[in-house]
UniProtKB/Swiss-Prot annotation:
The keyword DNA-binding applies. Residues 31-99 bind DNA. The lineage of its organism: Eukaryota, Metazoa, Chordata, Craniata, Vertebrata. Residues 120-137, 176-186 have a biased composition (Polar residues). It comes from the Eukaryota. Signal peptide: none annotated. SUPFAM superfamilies: HMG-box. Pfam families: HMG_box. Expressed at a low level in embryos, and in the adult lung, ovary, skeletal muscle, testis, brain and heart. It comes from Xenopus laevis (African clawed frog). This is Transcription factor Sox-12. Residues 1-22, 101-137, 152-193 are annotated as: Disordered.
Amino acid sequence: MVQNKTTGSCPKPTEVAPGGPSWCKTSNGHIKRPMNAFMVWSQIERRKLMSLCPNMHNADISRSLGQRWKLLQDTDKIPYVREAERLRLKHMADYPNYKYRPRRRSRTQESKTRARLPRSTATCQSVPSPCLSQMDTGSSMQWGETCPAWGGDQVGQSVETQIRESSARSPEVPTHTKTVPSSPQSAEEHEGLEGGSLVIPVDKEVPPHSGSHFEFPDHCTPEVMEMISGSGLLESVPDLVFSY
């Protein structure tokens, strides 16, 4: 029913093209392209639809015209195809030097579209992640404490300063291993341990493979043997651990 109404109520395609030498020019002197078959048909139907529905939006009108054009049969499109061909030949005769040049987009429109785009990338780069900064700080402090070469010169100097200060002071036994000597032999052994700043007693309660102590063979340097031989602590050599 839509197709019959469309073909029956439409005027003839020959009534579309106006006469005159400037029939395809605008007021600014711009030469328009010749109309194709759909443009010829839609020009007639648009006027009719706007007269029936004056409050209808232009986008809705164009959408409705496109759907109705697809529903038309090929036999119904033949008159509009012929009219479009006639307009093309007339356009070539009136404007032989015409070349189609599409309009370029103005810079003001491009700047407006760029200003509307969200700036999510800039916000992500400006705000650092707290998790990453915390991981970086923790890893650098750990490497600086365990290995001064990786941690930098300042960390290495601070570690050396702490070692010198601790060696200058009286050596203190850790709280979990500090015991009061109960016999003269243990007192002499305790005094011998105080003589060397790098000698620490072994914590026998910790398993050997716990990772907190290092295992060394039961031998030492001649200098240490001479130091121990005077105090009578040769029997307790295997119980000592030397940290370098």
